[in-house]
Amino acid sequence: MLNQMSGVGDSNIPGIFVTTKEELEEKWKIHGIQAVYLIDQIEPLRVIKQLGGACIYLEKQNGIICCEADYIWQMSDETDVPDDTYIQRVWQRHMHLPWLITKTEHLILRESVMEDLPCFQQFYKEERGNPDVQQLCEGEEQLRTYIAARYPLFEYGLWTIVDKATGTVFGRAGIEELPEDYGDLAGEPELSYLIGKEYRGSGIAKEACQAILHYAAEELEMKRIYLRTSRENFHSRKLAEKLGLLKVESITEYKDLLYCGLLTFER
């Protein structure tokens, strides 16, 4: 099993400013791939891409617009540079390592990895026939595609819930989108979660979902989020109420309940 902190959070990868091709070559000899290079010129950007290193293009106001960079930081002034968290995440994405999303008192939420698959398969197997649970993890190829396509494009999705103390995978939770049959609400952020049966009843879902709501407001700057559940799912309905989500009228043919939360955390 993947250690709960493997590849996330504490990489301490430096961000190194370079302005010329020659300077880049000197820095590369020292740091190699174990750095993120902060570049504001096209020539060194092309060199670092050829070398296979991670880089962020610093786009100054009224400066050169670069379409070749994987990551662009739009500077508001000369002091506006990427912070350590952004630098670590650029490097982790470049190295195909999972992002640490957030921590709580007992949990870590991180991007999923292939080593999580056996746990996911067991969790979804337990829920076959449950109308509230969409079977989202049937095999290796499905999870591999999700990791490769979802996280880089959206920077959110379903994440893995891990016990901070032991590294045990408790379930999945995160943010996706309401489906097309929700009319004008289609595509709106949806809070989703699935906890393994043996781990239920200990507050894991509430703790994880509270952290996700806070992350959605603070980091993703979302204004509202929805949660769907069937009328028969008493536990999900109670959780929605505990999270402060308000029930709104169902608009689908499936007769499910829809809850909405306004994300108004103070900054």
Regions found by a protein language model. Give the residues of each.
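Conserved acetyl-CoA-binding loop-helix of GNAT-fold acetyltransferases
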Residues: 201-218, 234-242
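Alpha-helical elements of the RecA-like P-loop NTPase motor core of helicases
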Residues: 45-46, 118, 237-238
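Conserved acetyl-CoA-binding loop of GNAT-fold acetyltransferases
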Residues: 51-55, 241-251
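Nucleotide-sugar donor-binding loop of glycosyltransferases
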Residues: 59, 231, 251
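Conserved beta-strand-loop-alpha-helix junction that forms the acyl-donor binding cleft
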Residues: 40-42, 227-237
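GNAT-family acyltransferases
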Residues: 4, 32, 73-198, 214-215, ...
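Asp-based, Mg2+/Mn2+-dependent phosphohydrolase catalytic module
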Residues: 1-102
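Positions that flank functional sites
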Residues: 63-64, 232, 255
